[in-house]
Amino acid sequence: MRIKKFLKKLFRLLGYKIEKIHPDIHELTFDEIYPKFLKNPVIFDVGANEGQSIERFKKIFVNFEIHCFEPNYSLYQKLKKKYENNKNIFVNNLAVSKEIGEGVLNITQKSGSSSMLDIKKNTKWLKVRSKQFNTDPDNFIKKKEKVSTVSLNDYCKTHDIKEVDILKIDTQGFEDKVLIGSSEMIKNQSIKFIELEIIQKEAYENNFSFYDLEK
């Protein structure tokens, strides 16, 4: 509850109100909006996975700087190798959280479902995902990996980054911790766009939901 109140208060202080978009209202995609306002953006890709968003941003912008964060060491190694000749792409083997420290990453059969949160048992989501990979729900988590964590406030201070044009977050229910760790940047209006990918299904223990902000 404290996290929910903090986030609502934080966005109110900045003059924003969070609510659902009416289904009848046409909305532009991020990819349509970004080029209208940004030319040489600094982008943070939190939850880089296999580099899907990196490739997407490469198609939108000619000149850019991307700092991507991927706690899964195996995926990090692949990203590091894939973009080793791109001087404007910085790959970090870190989990973004509310503070510097350590945590445990639950690595699942489907890499995109891996999370810093525990997976809820006996849910429809888990049964469906397990079936897709021909495994038992109890074995959907392949292994647990100890990871280093960082807050974006600290990362920006360490790397002398004054502004972030796009903050993309896809952390499987861990988004609130990322936002709390970005609070100074947000309060100083140093982040222009925040792109959140939020899971709405019951999947993780204490996962962040858009509905939390509406309550």
Which stretches of residues belong to each language-model region?
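Phosphate/nucleotide-binding beta-alpha loop and adjacent structural elements of enzyme active sites
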Residues: M1-K215
